[in-house]
């Protein structure tokens, strides 16, 4: 004979498994737009999230995505002709939209540029999902820090106002990958929450390490927008060092600079950096640094090597010459040797292919293809940290409320 109390409790727990927005209440599903090689997926998977759909239209990135996530439905078409209402609903939709028109290396056209304007397309897709009863509960938008300042902050304001019109509250934070891997990579995350499911949190602007000057300015300009501030902890102290990232390359490998290339490096290295390197060469200890080749500032357009002595790599970029190329500089046994950063090292700087992080992630394509893909991607542990301390904090509360409803029914029956 069935236990009526147990049955009633189970019915209460599963009452909303298929809610009005089309997704199972207990499932943590997401749609990954601008998916690239899938590093948002890699960040979410250990937290129990399942990809309902991925979308990108770069053939090389798509091959890499399919190699690592063959089970995920992947639509390889322009997002502008993608009808998300044709696909299963998801609790979360993510968008690492193109940064080229926002970044310092781009033409600074902002949201009017050909590429970065696709965030408007993304927001239109969210609006369409609302109209077909598949409104996502959460959104995650990621991009470069210039999103906060370009065109006097009007690009960010446009995104936030559109989210408000779609009845989402939002938090905006800046997180640097250097707290997780030895890479200086500061990024902006917009976490949006459906106000129909989660009451707005009205509180003072938390002027902290995650919400610095430009964000404070955005809040002062728009205090009446539905800001939804999360209680983030302090950013963690990084455990990985640059030595953990660097491959062990045999000294006989041709990837190391020859004498002519080494002399070229010494001829272009910044003066103060050259003095530091010369002093370290005399010290007898081994050291590992990264370096980039840049244009000398405030002078003629001539190249110069800058060496980082802070234990970090510079922000990974897509290959294209100039400062997009990073070098590994090693001092050992009184000698200086150098080479280009490898594809595996680029992957490790983004938090995969490491014993602690995604050791089985597959690198697909040529060395240049891999560097391009990772230069255009996200830092996996940084994204995971943002999700863990924002969206993840809301989902358990919902589950507890459903469970509490079942317990209350049990007490009533008893």
Where on the chain are the PLM-derived regions?
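C-terminal target-recognition/interaction regions appended to catalytic cores
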Residues: 17, 252-414
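Proline-centered helix-kink/hinge sites
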Residues: 97-98, 136, 353, 380
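Short aromatic/basic micro-patch
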Residues: 96, 138, 340-343
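Core alpha/beta nucleotide-donor-binding catalytic domains of modification enzymes
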Residues: 2-135, 145-157
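Short, solvent-exposed loop/turn segments at secondary-structure junctions
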Residues: 38, 59, 98-102, 145-146, ...
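Class I S-adenosyl-L-methionine
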Residues: 82-90, 104-308
């Amino acid at each position: 004979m069935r236990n009526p109390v147990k049955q009633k409790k189970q019915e209460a727990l599963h009452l909303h498994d298929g809610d009005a927005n089309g997704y199972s209440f207990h499932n943590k599903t997401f749609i990954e737009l601008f998916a690239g090689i899938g590093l948002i997926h890699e960040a979410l998977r250990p937290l129990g999230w399942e990809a309902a759909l991925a979308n990108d239209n770069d053939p090389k990135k798509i091959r890499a995505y399919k190699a690592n996530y063959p089970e995920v439905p992947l639509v390889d078409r322009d997002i502008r002709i993608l009808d998300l209402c044709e696909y299963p609903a998801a609790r979360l939709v993510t968008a690492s939209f193109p940064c080229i028109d926002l970044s310092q290396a781009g033409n600074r056209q902002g949201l009017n540029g050909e590429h970065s304007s696709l965030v408007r397309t993304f927001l239109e897709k969210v609006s369409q999902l609302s109209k077909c009863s598949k409104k996502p509960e959460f959104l995650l938008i990621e991009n470069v820090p210039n999103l906060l300042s370009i065109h006097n902050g009007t690009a960010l304001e446009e995104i936030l106002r559109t989210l408000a019109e779609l009845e989402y509250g939002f938090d905006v934070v800046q997180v640097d990958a250097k707290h997780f891997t030895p890479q200086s990579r500061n990024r902006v995350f917009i976490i949006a929450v459906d106000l129909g499911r989660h009451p707005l949190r009205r509180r003072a602007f938390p002027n902290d390490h995650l919400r610095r000057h430009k964000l404070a300015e955005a809040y002062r300009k728009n205090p009446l927008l539905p800001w939804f501030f999360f209680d983030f902890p302090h950013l963690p102290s990084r455990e990985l060092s640059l030595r953990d990232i660097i491959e062990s390359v045999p000294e006989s490998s041709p990837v190391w600079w020859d004498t002519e290339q080494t002399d070229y490096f010494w001829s272009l290295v910044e003066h103060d950096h050259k003095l530091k390197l010369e002093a370290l060469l005399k010290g007898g200890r081994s050291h590992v640094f990264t370096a980039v080749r840049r244009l000398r500032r405030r002078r003629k357009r001539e190249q110069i090597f800058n060496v980082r002595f802070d234990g970090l790599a510079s922000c990974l970029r897509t290959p294209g010459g100039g400062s997009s190329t990073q070098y590994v500089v090693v001092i050992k046994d009184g000698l200086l040797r150098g080479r280009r950063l490898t594809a595996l090292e680029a992957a490790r700087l983004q938090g995969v292919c490491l014993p602690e992080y995604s050791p089985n992630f597959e690198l697909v394509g040529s060395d240049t293809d891999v560097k391009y893909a990772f230069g255009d991607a996200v830092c996996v542990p940084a994204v995971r940290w943002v999700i863990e301390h924002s969206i993840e904090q809301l989902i358990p509360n919902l589950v507890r409320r459903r469970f509490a409803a079942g317990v209350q029914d049990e007490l009533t029956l008893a």
